[in-house]
Design a protein with these regions (language model features):
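Membrane-embedded beta-strand positions of outer-membrane beta-barrel proteins
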Residues: 38-40, 54, 65-69, 90, ...
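Bacterial N-terminal signal peptides
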Residues: 7-15
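Outer-membrane beta-barrel translocator domains and adjoining extracellular loop/strand segments
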Residues: 52, 78-82, 119-127, 164-172
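Short loop/turn motifs that connect adjacent beta-strands in outer-membrane beta-barrel proteins
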Residues: 24-34, 59-62, 97-106, 145-151
């Protein structure tokens, strides 16, 4: 009889433990809601700069702020014009759909200010020339979060002004040069950023 009571108690204990484990398993229990992230712009080295971003979520407002800095010359010089300088940008993300579980995840709209400042060798006479441009962009994107891994995909466009480079590329945005037309006041930008949350 004691053997059967012991088996019954053991069976009850195991079944209660398994039920409790199943009921406590939710995606939220496996996915923490991190409010900060550090990101690198994927393949930015191939365009002549290294870009690092920091993002902070404001979960009560379904928003986040993101600042990005870029060291121009830390990468492959695709135009062979030896650029040296920096880019600064700030974007404020407005997440478009309810996502109460993960503050940094989802589709978003982002207005963004960009300032690009660098010297390069001019294609016309190889003299050192200053490219000093600013831009105001509107971007749309999607940010994916899995545990601590983050991937950010976005594109957008807007208005630019300043002293443009003869390549039209400003290490953060490009001036319009498609469809047989060039416009130094239309800026386009797109990117993929990969990072970690904490």
């Amino acid at each position: 009889m004691r053997k059967w009571i012991a088996i019954f108690v053991f069976s009850c204990f195991v079944s209660l433990t398994l039920c409790r484990a199943e009921s406590s398993y939710t995606p939220e229990s496996q996915q923490g809601d991190y409010l900060n992230s550090i990101k690198l712009t994927f393949l930015s080295w191939l365009s002549g700069s290294t870009k690092i971003s920091y993002e902070r979520a404001f979960p009560l407002h379904k928003q986040s702020g993101e600042i990005c800095t870029s060291l121009i010359s830390a990468g492959y010089d695709k135009y062979a014009n030896k650029p040296v300088g920096f880019t600064l940008r700030y974007g404020h993300k407005f997440f478009m759909f309810d996502n109460n579980d993960i503050s940094l995840k989802g589709f978003y709209l982002r207005p963004e200010l960009i300032y690009s400042h660098y010297l390069y060798n001019s294609a016309a006479d190889c003299t050192r020339t200053l490219a000093n441009m600013g831009a105001l962009l509107g971007t749309v994107g999607y940010q994916y979060v899995y545990k601590r891994f983050l991937a950010d995909f976005w594109f957008g466009g807007g208005y630019a002004l300043g002293n443009e480079a003869d390549t039209g590329y400003h290490h953060g945005f490009e001036l319009w040069h498609w469809l047989g037309a060039y416009n130094p006041n239309i800026a386009m930008s797109f990117s993929i950023r990969l990072g970690i949350c904490f």
